[in-house]
Amino acid sequence: MVYNFKVFKKCAPNGKITLYMAKRDFVDHISTVEPIDGVVLLDEEYVRGRKVFGQMVCTFRYGREEDEVMGLNFYKELFLASEQIYPPPEKRNYELSRTQERLIKKLGDGAIPFRLTVPPGAPGSVILQPGLEDDGEPCGVQYYVKIFVGDSEIDRSHRRSTVALGIRKVQYAPAKPGPQPCTVVRKDFVLSPGQLELELTLDKQLYIHGETVAVNMCVRNHSNKVVKKIKACIQQGVDVVLFQNGQYRNIVASIETQDGCPLQPGSSLQKVLHLTPTLAHNRDKRGIALDGQLKRSDTTLASTTLLLDPDQRDAFGIVVSYSAKVKLYLGAISGELVAELPFILMHPKEGRVKMIHADSQADVEMFRQDTVHHQESVEVY
């Protein structure tokens, strides 16, 4: 029987340290986060008498690079996990994964496994879409694994003996969605009798990226006012927790209609409005929140941020939410009636291992293990 498995591979510039990782997406299950594990292949002559450390680094950029003048910078690095890889500990407090076991068997004595434990409150990988004329790194939260040679874990690493590989911290759609969203709002008028009533219902609470959101709307006009126009939109809420006034909203899909209008007093209207929030229609908008992106990978609108406790938010995080909003226009004097429903927009949990590709940060190496003849071959992509 033949087993094939692919891993990401990246070497230090001096060729003495090589990092192998089976994946670059680590799932946040809200209460816990998948550990980051891999294998480091070391040149035994080079590391003799030295120490090798592994770290998970979170970078948070909250301003444009071109605005950094006179020593001012808008960039923070957070070291969320750290471990001494070499010399290895006498006793390991975790079990090796199957990929780690296979890599150690294939690579030989110089291969050392490692595992970094991620705190559950760490922010998700989210970036803010830059403007068309902006240069430099986008604002947002990104992660990478860093392997380096140094005297201590706080020692400044040298570029030639350092490996840094970008990763992502992601969340997937929950297995059990919540109740169907529904709301009813009413508007009274000071000098007129009766009410205008707007009822909104979504067909479900959880939507997958690319799905169409069906907004079921029912208007009951018990007043003597006239509804002249209806406008619906999907809003993306972005909360940059670091700033007190860091909350704003982006319209990522919208529709305006006069079907059934003008809606006269004593009339009612039932209508279903279809809206599809996608990045394809928002590529020219600065500040749209996107899922963290690896090289050569496509991205989408940022997924909804799920929090165990909404009051316990990381100060360096970006919290994303979505809502469907419908507005009835009654004219300049009578004003408007607005209803809003929050919903969840996420990626489904992957049912199978997805295809992985090489990029400018990491090669992809395939190991082929023949368990009958105990022979192995390696192919590099």
UniProtKB/Swiss-Prot annotation:
Record key words, sorted: Sensory transduction
Disulfide partners: none
The family this protein is said to belong to: Belongs to the arrestin family.
Source taxon at top rank: Eukaryota
Lineage: Eukaryota, Metazoa, Ecdysozoa, Arthropoda, Hexapoda
BP-aspect Gene Ontology terms: G protein-coupled receptor internalization; signal transduction
Record-linked Gene3D superfamilies: 2.60.40.640, 2.60.40.840
Organism: Heliothis virescens (Tobacco budworm moth)
Gene Ontology cellular component annotations, sorted alphabetically: cytoplasm
Any one GO molecular-function label of the UniProt entry: G protein-coupled receptor binding
Pfam families: Arrestin_C, Arrestin_N
Name of the protein in its database record: Arrestin homolog
